[in-house]
Amino acid sequence: MERFWEHSWKRVDPERVAGYVQSIDMAPDALISALHRHGVKTVCDAGCGCGAYAMKLAANGFSVCGFDVSSRAVEIAQTLLEKAALAAELKTAGILSTGYADGTFDGVVCRDVLDHLPRAEAAAAVKELCRITKPGGIVIFTLDPLDEEYRTEPHRVNADGDYVY
């Protein structure tokens, strides 16, 4: 899985990503509001990719850490954060073993990551993200819709019916 994402991100032009991130509102206001309502101060962007959520979270006053399995994605995210004069502590790590201590964050957001994992790994990832969240904290997941467009992308279907891209 790591090789797939590293290969995918190596082909990405950071300038195009910057334009894309600026042209759309990646983190919906409802997500930001939910985090504020729950008193979240520290938040982890799990599977941060190009840093779109990290940027929106930092711009809204959160102390942000994040990780991605692709070192190239983390590099692009850091560049975009610096260009926007925003701060987040990002690192390369996998979602099954983040390297954070128990209860590090008030909240965790995980955008469109779990649906790229086999079911057993997705369940383990949920446990890991709950582990790094403080008791009483909030964990928010989003999933890609399974549109016809996605079904035409290269994938395999596991025995349990999961689509793995």
State what each model feature region is.
Residues 110-113:
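A short beta-strand submotif of the Rossmann-like class I SAM-dependent methyltransferase core
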Residues 1-40, 49-97, 121-124, 138-165:
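Class I (Rossmann-like) S-adenosyl-L-methionine-dependent methyltransferase catalytic domain
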Residues 123-135:
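A short glycine-rich, Lys/Arg-flanked "PGG" loop and its adjoining helix->strand segment in the class I
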Residues 96-108:
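A short acidic, Gly/Pro-enriched loop at the edge of an enzyme's catalytic core
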Residues 115-117:
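A short His-aromatic
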Residues 46:
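Conserved beta-strand/loop positions that form the S-adenosyl-L-methionine
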